[in-house]
Amino acid sequence: MPIKLGIVPVTPYEQNCSILVCQETGDAAVVDPGGDIEKILDGVKQMGGSVKKILLTHGHLDHCAAAKDLADQLDVPIEGPQEDERFWIDQLPEQTVRFGFGHAKVFEPDRWLNNGDHVKVGNVDFEVFHCPGHTPGHVVFFDKEDRLAIVGDVLFAGSIGRTDFPRGNHADLINAIKTKLWPLGDDVQFVPGHGPMSTFGQERKTNPYVGDRA
């Protein structure tokens, strides 16, 4: 397996911050650093990686509140999410104060991502899928070779992302899961934004919202 995966739960919301390390090069990416920077850096150190970029699935504070500080500290770029997520990122200072997260900075990602784009972590390629519904500019990262997806708050073990936030859309979320994620294969393991990992096949069998019987 060319990619090495570590998961560090961060913030009071226990958000799954993923650390991805290319085993061939040692290059690493941090996905969705919502907070607890020292905890994340300890995880990177334990995995033996050298962080080259930060990847973001979407703009909610528990996924990206520490992105700017971490990027500045490590002098690395931020890639993602899709540009419709500017709506949420611009609210970070207000949202983080309101929910007791300190005071996060507004930032402009170095690269907005679109459906069909690719991002590299060392020699490992991740395809980008735009999966709106939970938020308008949410993206999913898929490593075809390792059969691994980082899905943020699109899909969970036994559930799906909330769609009652501003600019959320339930029909869009269901459509994105069924038309973009399911075709990738039942054997694909995924890291959700919260809770345990699962596979697309398991969710197709048992998920009450997007399973084949739903």
Located regions from the model:
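Conserved beta-strand hairpin/beta-sheet module of binuclear metal-dependent hydrolase folds
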Residues: 2-47, 140-152
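Short Gly/Pro-enriched turn/cap motifs at secondary-structure boundaries
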Residues: 8-10, 102, 108-110, 130-132
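Conserved S/T- and glycine-rich ATP-binding loop of Class I adenylate-forming
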Residues: 20, 57, 131
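A short, N-terminal amphipathic alpha-helix
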Residues: 24, 39-46, 66, 176-185
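Short catalytic-loop micro-motif centered on adjacent basic/acidic residues
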Residues: 29-31, 53-55, 128
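Active-site HxH/HxHxD metal-binding segment of metal-dependent hydrolases
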Residues: 36-120, 124, 205-213
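Metallo-beta-lactamase
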Residues: 94-95, 118, 124-214
